[in-house]
Amino acid sequence: PRPDENVRQLDDFFAALPDAPQPHIELRSEHLLRGPYFDWLAERGLGHVFSHWTWLPPLRRQWSMSGERLTAADGQVVTRLLTPRDTKYAEAYATAHPFEEPVAELSKTEQAHDMVLDVTALAFRAEAQNATLNVIANNRAWGNAPDLNRTVAHRILDHVEGRE
């Protein structure tokens, strides 16, 4: 749909739902990530899911597209690290399988490095707005989701220690 039509359809759908639990919306079409969508999220107090996924722009660009604002009324922020950008699901799955450890073809790339930096930046943006970042990692993004989350956590801690 067109961006304005998408917002209308979302509004019709969410108007019929109770306010709790707090919804966060994940859109996987870049052309829908426009000002009216983020304005609508803010008006309704709904959250946007910042997704690192095949066909979406980098997380930092999504942050910029959002107007550098967090919109969830409950103060929660969600990011999903699903697949490398420009990599189809089946290809990422085959590369990451059996998911027991980081896979260099996924975890040692410039894009993977940028993903970790973007999540780190989003964590500090959330902190600055008194929000909590929830990171949902997938094995396909790195080879092993627990290791990806550890890497992000260590990057955040390293940054915090550097500020002290």
Predicted regions and their residues:
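Residues lining hydrophobic/aromatic ligand-binding pockets adjacent to catalytic sites
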Residues: 1-164
